[in-house]
């Protein structure tokens, strides 16, 4: 069994002003896990994950400090240490409503999603990271 500090994983910046940091922890392309993808998102104070849709995957989203979850234009206040659910094909976004704390989102995608956007480059860097850790 391997243990990794999540903050050591490589990240990619997504979004604009302010950006959020995305770390890909588990995926078919990195760990060989075929059933799901697991992503960590760090959303800065006042940041947002801009509305987006996953056509092929359901997404379960854990909010560490709470925030706001919007799905199909319906707004939900999310309490600390809560879980939100976005079925595949639904437009959704996560919002950090604090002024001074980073919102950490743990996102579970079932089934695993196909890489898009910045993910292929992030997959390459994540594989390098895992390989170096396994050599130690």
Regions found by a protein language model. Name each.
Residues 1-35, 121-136:
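A short, N-terminal "cap"/entry segment at the start of jelly-roll beta-barrel domains
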Residues 19-58:
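Active-site region of the double-stranded beta-helix
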Residues 30-34, 43-47, 66-68, 90, ...:
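Short, charged/polar surface micro-motifs in flexible loops or helix N-caps
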Residues 48, 54-80, 90-93:
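A short beta-strand-loop-beta hairpin characteristic of the jelly-roll/cupin
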Residues 39-41, 82, 92:
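Hydrophobic/aromatic beta-strand elements that line small-molecule binding cavities or substrate pockets
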Residues 32, 88-118:
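Ligand-binding loop in jelly-roll beta-barrel domains
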